[in-house]
Amino acid sequence: MLTIFAISDSIAETAHQVTLAVAAQFKEKIKIRRVPYIKTIDDVDCIFPEIAKIERKIIISTIITVDVREYLTKKCYEKNIYIMNVLGPLIDSISSMLNTNPEYKPGAMRQIDEIYYKRIEAMEFAMQYDDSKDYGGLKNADVVLIGLSRTSKTPLSMYLANKGVKAINIPLMPEIGVPDEIYTIDKKKIFGLKIDAFQLIEIRKKRLDKFHRISSSIEYAGDERILEELEYSDRIMKRLGCKTIDITQRAIEDTALIILESIGYNKNTNIY
């Protein structure tokens, strides 16, 4: 039986997945052994006696660090063991095309996976706590958005979620008030979305026209009603002492950028 050693200087997930994909092309039974965290030349020396015991073997390596990768390759050549460096040649080719040196970061793929799953978690969070569905997420939120109806709270929450930021949004309505819990969280997390009265009237009227709502919803887009709501939202935001952002004629991306900078968000990957 053939044994394939999936060796890496991280958790060996990439090497393991590549090996599984290749092994699936054959009917014969193939044993796969994952060998993670081979970070030094000494680590290579430690695993070699065990590898040498196996009669039929191949090594699949995703080791990033050059000296460790080259040492492993040299040992394999000396022992007449077939080795495939999965990432090395590709890194070298891309480095040549870009005319720049790679960072050689072990576990970089795992970091990208973590960023991806953080985004998914943030999106689920945003949907769960959208528009006052549940205030239980306040203490776990990275950002709390407050504002009147039609101030882009939901799309802004989803945009932030795509950056891995957990955002909860709370609508401001004079008849309902805000949850008491909001006064217990760090005000630096809270962002009040303000808007010009004339633009809000226009947005709400278009909303009503879209759904052909007239009689029971006239107040929703009425001048007096909107001015009352704006005064109420101003009072709440002042009481909370939170940062306010005027979203009038402002793109969601611009509003999000202000928030991300305020909470110290760092873009930590160059993968898009």
Curated annotation (Swiss-Prot):
Q: Please give one Pfam family short name.
A: Kinase-PPPase
Please provide the record's keywords in A-Z order. Kinase, Nucleotide-binding, Serine/threonine-protein kinase, Transferase
Task: Cite a single GO MF annotation.
Answer: ATP binding
Answer yes or no on keyword Kinase: yes
- Binding positions for ADP per the UniProt entry: 147-154
EC code: 2.7.11.32, 2.7.4.27
Which reactions appear under catalytic activity for this entry? N(tele)-phospho-L-histidyl/L-threonyl-[pyruvate, phosphate dikinase] + ADP = N(tele)-phospho-L-histidyl/O-phospho-L-threonyl-[pyruvate, phosphate dikinase] + AMP + H(+); N(tele)-phospho-L-histidyl/O-phospho-L-threonyl-[pyruvate, phosphate dikinase] + phosphate + H(+) = N(tele)-phospho-L-histidyl/L-threonyl-[pyruvate, phosphate dikinase] + diphosphate
Q: Which InterPro entries match?
A: Kinase-pyrophosphorylase, PPDK_reg
Point out the signal peptide segment. Answer: none
The entry sums up its family as follows: Belongs to the pyruvate, phosphate/water dikinase regulatory protein family. PDRP subfamily.
The UniProt function text for this chain reads: Bifunctional serine/threonine kinase and phosphorylase involved in the regulation of the pyruvate, phosphate dikinase (PPDK) by catalyzing its phosphorylation/dephosphorylation.
Annotated protein name in UniProt: Putative pyruvate, phosphate dikinase regulatory protein
